[in-house]
């Protein structure tokens, strides 16, 4: 899979939720993790048994105005808004950072304004931030990970996984060697 992605949360206040989201990001091979205006410290996320805090670069931004991403990285907010794109209809950017709202709060207006895209998971009501993270990252994996087509028959195995791209020698036009 080409590209990279990061995962973050704004205003997180519960250690278990921070640890859970970090573990999910680590499991899906995120390149980095971040928090915006956190209400706790990274060391409080003691619920993570995968040692994600030791495996992922972690960036903390005290205020939404301080938030920065790598050049070319697109910010994808995950929030229930009227104009949000439903996740099954969304094409994930190659270079992306996904930001989730905290337990009792929506994403702040400043973060929503910074988002290149806002997506929503088509559920009847809001779900836990860790669960939302798992759903979004699984959707990214399935839609960008090079998996074959789904089977038509229930319980059947999907199509073949396409082989990874191999780079060959540069192609060049043959020179016309006739004297002119």
Residue map of PLM features:
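Post-transcriptional modification and biogenesis factors for structured RNAs
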Residues: 1-180
């Amino acid at each position: 899979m080409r590209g990279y992605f990061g995962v973050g949360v704004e205003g997180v206040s519960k250690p278990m939720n921070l640890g859970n989201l970090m573990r999910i990001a680590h499991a899906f091979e995120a390149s980095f993790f971040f928090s915006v205006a956190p209400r706790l410290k990274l060391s409080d996320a003691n619920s993570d048994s995968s040692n994600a805090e030791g495996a992922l670069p972690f960036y903390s931004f005290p205020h939404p105005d301080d938030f920065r991403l790598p050049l070319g990285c697109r910010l994808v907010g995950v929030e229930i808004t009227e104009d949000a794109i439903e996740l099954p209809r969304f094409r994930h950017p190659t270079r992306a950072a996904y930001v989730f709202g905290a337990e009792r709060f929506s994403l702040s207006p400043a973060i929503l304004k910074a988002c290149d895209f806002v997506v929503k998971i088509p559920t009847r009501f809001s779900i836990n931030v860790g669960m939302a993270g798992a759903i979004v990252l699984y959707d990214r994996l399935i839609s960008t990970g090079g998996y074959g087509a789904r089977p038509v028959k229930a319980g059947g195995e999907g199509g073949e996984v396409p082989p990874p791209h191999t780079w060959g020698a540069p192609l060049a036009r043959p020179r016309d060697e006739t004297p002119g």
